[in-house]
């Protein structure tokens, strides 16, 4: 199977996992959802590329007065997203879902105030395809619109692993199906009509607590670390400190 076929098979198999469909770490997922929601205002037209089973898009439709479209290459994920929208939104039509991908976009989508990806680019096989995706996204933004690129950072993971090694923990390796974002490549990328506004390390406190402190405590007890450990919950109230979060938000603005 090709990389794309293997990737699709993986996400097809996870379509019915609810909040855990995109990641087993539900707390990390909620952090991502809050970070995205904070950048979206009422009245906006929003596109979620790689929407999975629609958790983030439906949440936006429930909590904001926005029109959101979600696309994903997994038919099973889209079916799950439509079911979730029907159960959560009833007769409301502020969220719609269709099969598609960054290299096979549905026709007639139009322009958007905000486009976001949530660990979608890392599922592409290399930086060349990731950069091409950013180019394509830039073309779908209205003037002044923003692309919220919520993706896994190689620099963030490296810094996190340095902390883990310093307390005797093994380094974390990225999942086999992913290509984490090279931060320097993003910083040096020129995209016509698009400007990199800022990078936000919004997960740093959480990953330090969960992957270093919690993991170290579990090791002392001879246990496997749990995503539900109480110490991980501190990140819900603490500000993001440092730059050891493996998920970052790159904020791009259309000129």
Predicted regions, residues:
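A short, conserved alpha-helix within the catalytic core of class I
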Residues: 124-136
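Short glycine-dipeptide loop
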Residues: 141-147
């Amino acid at each position: 199977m090709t990389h794309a076929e293997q990737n699709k098979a993986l996400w097809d198999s996870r379509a019915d996992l609810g909040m855990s469909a995109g990641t087993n770490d539900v707390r990390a997922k909620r952090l991502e959802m809050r970070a995205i929601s904070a950048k979206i205002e009422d009245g906006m037209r929003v596109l979620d590329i790689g929407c999975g089973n629609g958790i983030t898009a439906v949440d936006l439709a429930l909590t904001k007065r926005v029109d959101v479209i979600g696309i994903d290459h997994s038919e099973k994920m889209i079916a799950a997203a439509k079911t979730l929208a029907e159960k959560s939104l009833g007769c409301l039509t502020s969220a719609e879902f269709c099969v598609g991908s960054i290299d096979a976009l549905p026709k007639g989508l139009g322009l958007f105030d905000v486009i976001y990806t949530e660990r979608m680019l890392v599922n592409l096989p290399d930086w060349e395809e990731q950069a091409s995706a950013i180019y394509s996204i830039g073309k779908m933004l209205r003037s002044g619109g923003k692309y919220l690129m919520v993706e896994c950072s190689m620099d963030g993971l490296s810094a996190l692993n340095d902390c883990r090694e310093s307390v005797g923990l093994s380094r974390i390796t990225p999942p086999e199906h992913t290509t984490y974002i090279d931060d320097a490549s993003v910083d040096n990328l020129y995209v016509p009509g698009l400007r990199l506004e800022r990078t936000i390390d919004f997960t740093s406190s959480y990953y330090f607590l969960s992957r270093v402190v919690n993991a170290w405590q579990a090791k002392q007890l001879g246990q496997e670390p749990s995503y539900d450990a109480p110490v991980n919950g501190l990140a819900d109230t603490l500000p993001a400190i440092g730059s050891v979060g493996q998920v970052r938000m790159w904020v791009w603005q259309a000129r």
